Amino acid sequence: MNWCSNQERCGGCYYQEIPYEEELKIKEEEIRSLFAPLVMGDFPFEGIISSPKKEAYRNKMEFSFGDQEKDGPLCLGLHQKRSFFNILNTEDCRLPHPDMGKILLATREYFLDKGVGYFHKKRHEGYLRHLLIRRGEKTGEILVSLVHNLFAEKSFSEQDILQSLAVKNVRQESEENCVTETGGEAESIQDKKTFISEEALLKGWCESLLSLEKEGKLDGHFAGILHTKNESLADAVVNQGTEILYGKDFFYEKLLGLNFKITSFSFFQTNSLGAEKLYEKIREYADLSNTAVEKPIIFDLYSGTGTITQLMSEVAKEAYGVEIIEEAVESAKENAKENGIENCRFIAGDVLKVLEQNKAAMNQSGDIAEGNSANKEENGNILPRPDFIVVDPPRDGMHKRALDLIIRYGVNRLIYVACKPKSLARDLEPLQAAGYRVKRLCAVDMFPRTNNVETIALLQKEES
């Protein structure tokens, strides 16, 4: 039995054909083989923690518009395996919640019916680029954003319209056993080229999605429906302006009793239930109850919407989150306020630059007194010396200079969270050279059916 209709062609999954228990064993052995030769001293690997859900676990998906073959009908979904251009219709993908598949299908059918073209990577023309869908696991709130190019007549090319008409004619032929005449087809092309504005097009799309909810076809409900302009030539989602078509531009998710406000572009773990397992393990590793400092200063670097910062705040005097995406920082501040947390501070900036500025300020004024909260954000991001550090960097890990600055703080213990184990493996070398040793290490399967896995390492500085 196939995992999904695109099992042989899609590059999204890796372990569809084997039992989940076997997948976990493979991932555990990969982590063991990667770190065993690198870790100095005892090898404290604790194995892998399974995901609470094996499918329908993803709370975020980024789908692409395109076609499966040159000049084929409009497709919306994921890239074909080993292909930069070909897009597969993936509304039956089993990684996200089924609500996302229904939204995906409704969106594709709507724009196919309107004869709207996708953005061609080579010709740099066309309208439709990506569809971002996020859904709260605990709240059921759904946030959808259509990412598109500048609206122009080329968005409705004759080829695109002919393709949409051909699809409609096939449907009519199967349903009514009749075919549209050539003259009628030509007339329809002309009508489609002139009858709709961007405002009307987007309004119609929004209404087509809302009808899913009104007709009871979704388990969740829409928090917001948005559209985002992206005129960049890069094949990536670039936010050059987002407008609300319905509702609001954020939704809420709950983790470990806390509320988190999330926008289309906020970093947030894509497996909410798995994230709870991850963060529970981080709190266990931190175990600040028996430290010399009763209420430590904690740094959460690459903090996203401030999830770890807030979860660590209950054992901290002050917890500082540093994140480069300003939108995520604003969400983090709002999240902390809504959760009634008063000892969190969030700084918008690149981790390397913030640490360099802090180092320069400390050199000028001498070491900043422990716990001095005089500020920080208003006074050049000056931060007190941390007692404990958590880093959760992007997939490629930390910049070497940022890691050097973290090491220079000389904290007794730090936690490194890695969504790409090889990045942690690379960064272990300078950390161990500076006297840190891995005291605890585990993997968390945040991405079932894929070959990705999260790792957590607790490092402690040896006494010289």
What kind of region is each of these model predictions?
Residues N2-I18:
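Local cysteine-cluster metal-coordination motifs and their immediate loop/turn environment
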Residues C13, L131, K420:
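Residue-level signal for inorganic ion chemistry
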Residues Y14-H120, K138:
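Extended interfacial segments that mediate partner engagement and assembly in macromolecular machines
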Residues E46-K54, K121-R123, R129-R134, E231, ...:
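Short, solvent-exposed loop/turn elements at beta->coil junctions and helix N-caps
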Residues N59, G140-I142, P296:
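Nucleotide donor/acceptor-binding cores
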Residues F65-E69, R135-E137, K229, D445, ...:
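Short, low-complexity Ser/Thr-rich regulatory SLiMs
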Residues P73-L74, Q80-L104, R108-D113, G117-A166, ...:
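Upstream accessory/linker segments immediately N-terminal to the RecA-like ATPase cores of bacterial MutS
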Residues F151-G184, S188-S464:
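Rossmann-like S-adenosyl-L-methionine
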